[in-house]
């Protein structure tokens, strides 16, 4: 079944959904404390180039996706040396009914970022998150390195 995938800029009206999704076991496994993550999502959109969106399948919000500027961070060290033009992606699907749509969601977001003029994208899934890694590979991301906890993957526009 084909879905219409769109992205709605996150605002305060989404916070109750984000909080609920961040508490879901399948999200919590890979993301941090729900309240801390919610604060980071709200903070990021204001001052560091992070753009957060609710993922909407047809007319239903099902998760969260963001693009961010890795060059603005050095939390784990791998971000150092990346060009300011590189965009990072973070994503989770909160609604269990929407699991299995990751490839379509990521593909649509990649298309959006490429259309906006971004040519180099990175993502850093946990090494143990094999389902996410497979989805990113299906979209076209390739491994270029790793940290103690993450696989570093990139996708460059051809």
Predicted regions and their residues:
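Conserved N-terminal entry element of GNAT/NAT acetyltransferase domains
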Residues: 1-13, 158
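Conserved active-site alpha-helix within GNAT-family acetyltransferase domains
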Residues: 103, 108, 127-145
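Conserved beta-strand-loop-alpha-helix junction that forms the acyl-donor binding cleft
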Residues: 93, 114, 122-133, 149-158
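Terminal substrate-recognition subdomain of acyl/acetyltransferases
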Residues: 2, 137-138, 142-158
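Acetyl-CoA-dependent GNAT
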Residues: 41-98, 112
